[in-house]
Regions:
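Terminal, non-catalytic protein-protein interaction segments that mediate quaternary/complex assembly
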Residues: 2-223
């Protein structure tokens, strides 16, 4: 199957929840992915999660840990980029974050730190509250002016955008790169919690979650 055909198929997919999406793309990457560095990847993938708050991954082989995902979400919510905060919340610091941290223990790709930068979250909530049909309710995560800070890790996400449709809050997440095994499982949990946070502030229901990744992949050791 060509990359073009893969794009067309994936852009039309709707899933009830994150677990259904995970299992589908786990098989899809293995069968139709392209070898790309030390991964197998699908390109320009987009899909919809109809029930974003059904955000648990039940795949037994993956052995996803909801307590860790919640700790990571609380870390982001704190706005503190230092891995010591995650250690306090989870009881230990996962080695991957130690590798990504700078000499002071900060991870500048931390979504919470980026989300609160320039009061972006408050701006989004105020914009949606005052103008329901706005197209400006977006949070920028990736910032080219911060390239010098991305020495050990670069944000996988470009931006998060919110739109009110039929009095429900929809959310779109745009990613440059998304590792299905680790990244998607924990990221979708945190993003769905951001969606819920904003919806609660606006006193409305959560709508759909649109997930777009330029490169959705599995590392070779997970294939």
């Amino acid at each position: 199957m060509s990359i073009t055909n893969t794009i067309i198929i994936n852009m039309r997919r709707k899933f009830k929840n994150a677990d259904e999406a995970y299992n589908y793309f786990l098989d899809k990457i293995i069968t139709d992915g392209k070898d790309f560095g030390n991964t197998r990847a699908l390109f320009n993938v987009g899909f919809t999660l109809e029930n974003p708050l059904e955000n648990y991954i039940f795949n037994k082989e993956r052995n996803w840990k909801p307590d860790y995902a919640e700790a990571e979400w609380q870390w982001y919510l704190s706005g503190d980029p230092n891995i010591k905060k995650l250690g306090q919340l989870y009881g230990k610091i996962p080695p991957i974050w130690e590798r990504m941290a700078d000499s002071k223990g900060n991870v500048m790709s931390n979504y919470g730190w980026q989300m609160y930068r320039n009061n972006q979250l408050d701006y989004v909530i105020a914009k949606l509250r005052n103008e329901k049909d706005t197209r400006h309710a977006a949070i920028s995560i990736y910032d080219c002016k911060e390239h010098k800070h991305y020495r050990k890790d670069t944000p996988c996400t470009y931006a998060i955008q919110f739109t009110i449709v039929d009095n429900r809050l929809n959310m779109a997440v745009l990613m440059r790169s998304n590792d299905l095994w680790y990244g998607f499982c924990n990221d979708q949990y945190c993003f769905s919690m951001i969606q819920k946070l904003v919806a609660d502030e606006l006193n409305m229901k959560v709508g759909e979650y649109y997930h777009y990744a330029h490169n959705l992949h599995l590392y070779n050791d997970k294939i």
